Amino acid sequence: MVAIKNLFLLAATAVSVLAAPSPLDARATWTCINQQLNPKTNKWEDKRLLYSQAKAESNSHHAPLSDGKTGSSYPHWFTNGYDGNGKLIKGRTPIKFGKADCDRPPKHSQNGMGKDDHYLLEFPTFPDGHDYKFDSKKPKEDPGPARVIYTYPNKVFCGIVAHQRGNQGDLRLCSH
């Protein structure tokens, strides 16, 4: 009887551990802090933006598999501090995503479509999950502050990054 109770407790514990979402689980919510200009006060204010990983992954799957060859130039290469030969640019620190496909140095040919190319792409993603109009020319749709990062050519989800202020400047990994 004691053995059966212990077996039941072990099984219940295993089920609850397995049911908990992993950090890169599609059910994850990513939080990005972005400074946005308040039009009433004309001052920059921190905004907490929430992104669904499932919606961000969906955005990346709707994006064409190209590097800047659309009307909007998205998706395009996310250098992550590297040159096209996989050498780290002096003074740059790459973002660590915690996935081998995402963290390895890139190989990016001149046109971005070489047989052995592997690199990261960035594509706009939004809290409401709508798809970015990648073929919009001028005026192109506002890409917002956040980007879903994924691999070329196999579209492995790496994470969500965001600009710290508006939609300009360095990109930082959002928390999840």
From Swiss-Prot:
<comment type="function">
    <text>This purine-specific ribonuclease cleaves 28S RNA in eukaryotic ribosomes, inhibits protein synthesis, and shows antitumor activity.</text>
</comment>
<dbReference type="GO" id="GO:0004521">
    <property type="term" value="F:RNA endonuclease activity"/>
</dbReference>
<keyword id="KW-0964">Secreted</keyword>
<protein>
    <recommendedName>
        <fullName>Ribonuclease mitogillin</fullName>
        <ecNumber>3.1.27.-</ecNumber>
    </recommendedName>
</protein>
<feature type="disulfide bond">
    <location>
        <begin position="32"/>
        <end position="174"/>
    </location>
</feature>
<feature type="signal peptide">
    <location>
        <begin position="1"/>
        <end position="27"/>
    </location>
</feature>
<dbReference type="GO" id="GO:0003723">
    <property type="term" value="F:RNA binding"/>
</dbReference>
<dbReference type="GO" id="GO:0005576">
    <property type="term" value="C:extracellular region"/>
</dbReference>
<dbReference type="InterPro" id="IPR004025">
    <property type="entry name" value="Fun_ribotoxin"/>
</dbReference>
<keyword id="KW-0652">Protein synthesis inhibitor</keyword>
<keyword id="KW-0378">Hydrolase</keyword>
<comment type="similarity">
    <text>Belongs to the ribonuclease U2 family.</text>
</comment>
<feature type="active site" description="Proton donor">
    <location>
        <position position="163"/>
    </location>
</feature>
<dbReference type="Pfam" id="PF00545">
    <property type="entry name" value="Ribonuclease"/>
</dbReference>
<dbReference type="GO" id="GO:0017148">
    <property type="term" value="P:negative regulation of translation"/>
</dbReference>
<dbReference type="InterPro" id="IPR000026">
    <property type="entry name" value="N1-like"/>
</dbReference>
<dbReference type="InterPro" id="IPR016191">
    <property type="entry name" value="Ribonuclease/ribotoxin"/>
</dbReference>
<dbReference type="InterPro" id="IPR048269">
    <property type="entry name" value="RNase_U2"/>
</dbReference>
<keyword id="KW-0540">Nuclease</keyword>
<feature type="active site" description="Proton acceptor">
    <location>
        <position position="122"/>
    </location>
</feature>
<feature type="active site">
    <location>
        <position position="76"/>
    </location>
</feature>
<keyword id="KW-1015">Disulfide bond</keyword>
<keyword id="KW-0732">Signal</keyword>
<feature type="disulfide bond">
    <location>
        <begin position="102"/>
        <end position="158"/>
    </location>
</feature>
